[in-house]
Regions:
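Sensory modules in modular signal-transduction proteins
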Residues: 4-29
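PAS-family sensory domains
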Residues: 79, 97, 108-111, 118-130
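Terminal output helix/cap of sensory domains in signal transduction proteins
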Residues: 12, 51-98
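Flexible loop/coil segments at beta-strand boundaries within sensory signal-transduction domains
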Residues: 98-102, 114-119
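Conserved hydrophobic beta-strand signature of PAS-family and PAS-like sensory domains
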Residues: 33-34
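PAS and PAS-like sensory/regulatory domains
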Residues: 92, 99, 104-108
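N-terminal capping loop/helix in small sensory signaling domains highlighted by a polar->aromatic N-x2-3-F motif
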Residues: 37-41
Length: 134
């Protein structure tokens, strides 16, 4: 099986993400997880070096994304899925379980990564846990 070289836009996005203190993850044009930074690792419960790249079905299974009302979310319903499928930025909140067993509620802003105006090569998702209420 021949593996396609990553698009330059994904390479630059990964380089940018490594420098951010905000949790950031990158998916490719299929929705597969191709990178997340150290800040994201703190919420996800494992480092990128431990996990590596994951197909969309596997990372959905591992992290169990769900609405804040505990309803399961499909990949297409998450901000990153919306950004990929609709080729537009998306913002929202949802919950997931980290690989360390801790549950998190996060707010996410995701935007498509374009190599040309008509070609989405991936999505960058920046997320954070909102501060606890009073």
């Amino acid at each position: 099986v021949e593996r396609k070289q990553p698009d330059l836009v994904l390479i630059v996005a990964r380089s940018f993400a490594t420098k951010l203190a905000t949790p950031t993850l990158i998916t490719d044009a299929r929705g597969d997880l191709v990178y997340f930074n150290d800040a994201a690792a703190e919420l996800l419960g494992r480092s990128y070096l431990d996990i590596g790249e994951l197909p969309v079905s596997r990372w959905q299974e591992l992290f169990e994304p769900r609405t804040l009302d505990e309803e399961p979310l499909t990949p297409e319903q998450t901000p990153s899925g919306i950004a990929l499928l609709e080729r537009r930025p998306a913002h929202g909140s949802f919950a997931f379980r980290g690989l360390d067993g801790r549950d998190h509620e996060i707010t996410v802003t995701a935007f498509p990564l374009l190599s040309r105006p008509d070609e989405v090569v991936g999505v960058m998702s920046i997320f954070w846990e909102p501060p606890a209420g009073p």
